[in-house]
Structures are given as structure tokens and as C-alpha cells.
Amino acid sequence: MAEVEQKKKRTFKKFTYRGVDLDQLLDMSYEQVMQLYCARQRRRLNRGLRRKQNSLLKRLRKAKKEAPPMEKPEVIKTHLRDMIILPEMVGSMVGVYNGKAFNQVEIKPEMIGHYLGEFSITYKPVKHGRPGIGATHSSRFIPLK
């Protein structure tokens, strides 16, 4: 019976970003983390974060600190679609503007190194219906309703 209980125990894959686990990423300095990023992200962070991006990080830190333990922090709305997701942002809730509304995004460890805009689609994907009159040569033979 004890063997059956041991088999039921699920093991989850521990998250690593380029071979470094999340706890170590959080302890690293920006310069050390930058070396793990792709060239585009490295170049962007090397040029420095602007005032708006620093204020977003500050607001995310504050929301995380004020959140009760074991609960998600409040959503912080932003227009900064070009913000690179940093390890310290993991666990935060961000409302990313898509040009019409704020899409709520929970930042997970797998998102590190990506841009916020990648998780808030700006267009409505096309749902193709039936072709209309004159759409193609063969559409002349499609009966009208």
C-alpha cells in the first residue's frame, strides 16, 4: 500500500532560465542576468531602463509588498508593451494595453526575457466566413441564401 501512495506523488519540472533556476535569478544582479538574455534584450537593458519603466517596476514591487501572503497582488495597468519581463516581475499581475482595453496578464517564470506586448494581442484574429459575391470566379455559382 505504501508503494502505491509513493507512485501517486507527482513531480513537477523545476523552472530554469538558460540553466539557472528562479531563486538564483532573483539573487543575481542586473548585469549577471543580462548575460543570460538574447542580444536584443541585452542591448536594450545595457542602454538602461527609462523613467516610465522604472516607475512600473516600483509600482509592481509596492503591489507585491502590500498583497496578503499566498494571494495575487493587485493589477497594475500599463501602456508599456515594450517592457522586457525581468525576474523580479514574476508573480505580478499586469494590465497590458492593446489599444482598446487592458488585458490582464499574470507574469510567470516562463515569460522572462519576453516583452509585455507579446502577451496582449492587438488585433482580433480573423474568423473566415463564407465568401461573398465576386470574391472569386467560382463564387458566382454559390447560391444566395
From Swiss-Prot:
GO terms in the biological process aspect are: ribosomal small subunit assembly; translation
Which domain of life does the UniProt lineage start with? Eukaryota
Q: Which GO terms describe its molecular function?
A: RNA binding; structural constituent of ribosome
According to the UniProt record, one GO cellular component term is:
cytosolic small ribosomal subunit
- The yes or no answer to whether the keyword Secreted is present is no
The UniProt keywords, alphabetically, are: Cytoplasm, Ribonucleoprotein, Ribosomal protein
The record's subcellular location field reads: Cytoplasm
Query: Any keyword Cytoplasm?
Result: yes
| Quaternary organization | Component of the small ribosomal subunit.
NCBIfam families assigned: PRK04038.1 (NF003121), uS19_arch (TIGR01025)
Q: Which family does it belong to?
A: Belongs to the universal ribosomal protein uS19 family.
Q: What is the purpose of this protein?
A: Component of the small ribosomal subunit. The ribosome is a large ribonucleoprotein complex responsible for the synthesis of proteins in the cell.
This chain belongs to the protein called Small ribosomal subunit protein uS19
Organism field: Xenopus laevis
